[in-house]
Amino acid sequence: MSQENLDLVRTRLNIVVEAFNARGVDAALPHIHPELVWNAPPEWLESDVYRGREGLRELATSWGQNFDEYRLDLERVVDLGDGRAVALVHQRGRLKGTGHPMEMAVGWIVELVDGQVARVDVYFSWEAALDAAGLSE
């Protein structure tokens, strides 16, 4: 992937994350491919695969019900070529009813199709995502 394409992936992910943080999942959906495949980590307690925009809405609703506050922060994007990249994403929030802070760094392997996020494979660590992508730090 050229620097131009890496910048495109980073820009698209920033748009999705910023829309989600400001206005919720529905604001992010126009930037999500209609045939999205979102693969949760194997350790995930809910469904392991979410499909399409409705699937992403289901995931956001299910996960979001655990928090009074929740946001994503895109920290880093690494080129994988062929419209794919690894993203380091920090999840931050306050657990519902307790006020206790939660922070967790996760890795996403992301693929864009027609400028939209079409696939996300989620890993519970940056290192696991890099390993799955055949990279290491």
Residue ranges and their predicted role:
Residues 5, 11, 25-83:
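A solvent-exposed, acidic/Ser-Thr-rich amphipathic alpha-helical stretch
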Residues 32, 91-93, 108, 124:
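Short beta-strand segments enriched in hydrophobic/aromatic residues
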Residues 66, 93-103:
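Short, cysteine-centered beta-strand-loop-beta hairpins and adjacent loop/turn segments enriched
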Residues 71-73, 101-108:
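Short, surface-exposed coil-to-beta transition loops
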Residues 81-91:
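A short hydrophobic beta-strand element
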Residues 84, 105-131:
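Short beta-strand edge/turn micro-motifs at domain boundaries
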